[in-house]
Amino acid sequence: MMRTTSVLSTLLAFTQAFYVPGTYKSYRDGDTIPLLVNKVYSDHSELQYAFTELPFVCPPTGRIRAGHLTSGTSITLNLGEVLRGDRIVVSDYELIMGIDEETRYLCSRTIDLEGIRKAKELIRDGYVAEWIVDNLPGATSFQTTDKSRKYYAAGFKLGDETTARSGGPAEYLLNNHVTLVIRYHRAPGKDGDKGKKVVVGFEVFPRSITASHRNDSGLPEHIEGEHEPLILAPQANSTNSTDTEDEPTTLTIPYTYSVYWREEERLEWQNRWDMYFVAQDDSANVHWLALVSSLLICGLLTAVVSVVLTRTIRSDIRGRQDLTLSSIKPKPNHKSLSPKREKANLLGPIADLDTEDIILDEEESEDVAAWKLLHGDIFRAPAYGGLLAPLIGSGMQLLYMAFGLLVLSTLGVLNPSFRGGYVSVGIGLFVFAGIFSGYFSARIYKTFGGQMWQKNVVVTAALIPGLLFATIFILNLFVWMQASSTALPFGTLIALIILWLCVQFPLVYAGSWFGFERMGAYTHPIRANAVPRQVPDHRWYLRNGQRFLLAGFVPFMVVFVELMFVVKSLWVDKTTYYYAFGFMGTVSAILMITVVEVTLVATYFLLRSENYHWWWHSFAIGGSSSIWVYAYLAYSYFTKLHISGFVSSMLFFAYGFLACAVYALLTGTVGFLAAYAFVRRIYGAIKVD
């Protein structure tokens, strides 16, 4: 208990995660800074689109830009950026440090009815565009409810849907003018002494301005005044044609922009991302309240487990001690096995309890605790052990990956400025953790009596990664048919296959060889009988369905609030960033402790009901909270989200199911290992003749 308290205290000290800002880039007055365009996305859809591929925006002209970059050139992306749908391209927008541009003409784009329809569809679904300057996403500026602080929401709207003034169908207004406000600060150190500056803010203010009343350069006559909006509808005056008999089928859209540079004296470069997290700071009290409630739940469970371990089980072992010791009737088919000393690990040597070894006699079964009657079957290999072992191995692989991601995120190595870093590093950790997957899978497989360890290697390396890859590939076909940037390019699919077969597979093989050949099976204090014991019928509350739902609800309550914030960031409001990794790390630690305690209690009551099928049971109990997590996702879909379209809905439920399956595998593995250590410990305290 003291050890648990100290661990939680340490984690509480780091609940506010920070980020490592990296290396700044400074600019002199007159330096050209490239503006990169990325993608458009919406809270109402799971489909994203590359900005430059939209049929109604200005296509790149191929002009040379800053740093010898050519407009239209794609920026090299990491694996995580590709998987999250990024398509970053150099634009034709020209930004020169320190030089304001009141109005500048970009281009005029003539679109047909299909282009108008696509623009209306994206505006109706609330799509926003993501642009990037100096690795900062263009943001829409807001004020807090008390108007004391300003904060950013990444992206800006493509347009607005309004009610027609004539009372007819809704009108769609396209934002064809943007005012770009670049905020800068004096560069730190010697660069600042040389007059250099760093970018600390990038604000975008979009407007819709009609195509009429423009000068010969395509600029509005008075940019600061009120203007009629640009309505997305074919217009006869979009061309010089005088034929009024035919219905207009095209619309010409002029694009302009303004640039203003403003010094920000109070915001330094290393804190420039704080503007995107102000909204999260307001919710810190909710995080703290949830953390306290999670600690209370964990503390209550700890008390229950303490009673079970220190009182109930100890009294079970000591109970009727004199009677059993005086009525020893040795049986030739039972032998006392002394546990061998292994290297220290979770499933290592069985520690001695402060109790004397007890001699059990089957004829005295009515006078001893029910769980001790299972000594001849408790370590019997489970059904489908060849499947359980790879699942446990993959669960350990995910556990190492999740731990690494949480540590790196809490330390600030993984942060929003490292775009795609969370996914890229996660894949890397998962692949290289294959060696742990093979090691644990092989040892458990051999413990179950398996001999074909090469077959176990194939199952371990292919089962979970193969199912994930196959599901993502099938979903990718639907996304590809929608021409979305979320669709994985063919080269990325090949790269993932290479990582899987050429990197992870050999690592799983190496770990399996070491675990199977060098370390061997885990030892058990009691040998299984030749004839299995019959399992009695259970009461209704001990049946699997009810038991899993009840056991899973407690861990779900621990993670509920953090899950709510994650769902909000991923689906409800995609313009926000989730960066409360300090809270997430602490809640994750509490979750693991809760899963362990719930599994121990459930396993104990299972054994008390004279059921020795605890292997799969402990795995299922540990992962049972995933049922509630998926139920919450479904609830959010129908009550909080506004996702429309068959493909987007399918992607939501499919990716939600994959996330819950991974979560179940991870927590199920934790539950299994806890139950395994628990069972070996309590049965190691008795000696059977």
Residue ranges and their predicted role:
Residues K25, D29, G319-N333, Y522-D537, ...:
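Cytosolic juxtamembrane regulatory segments of membrane proteins
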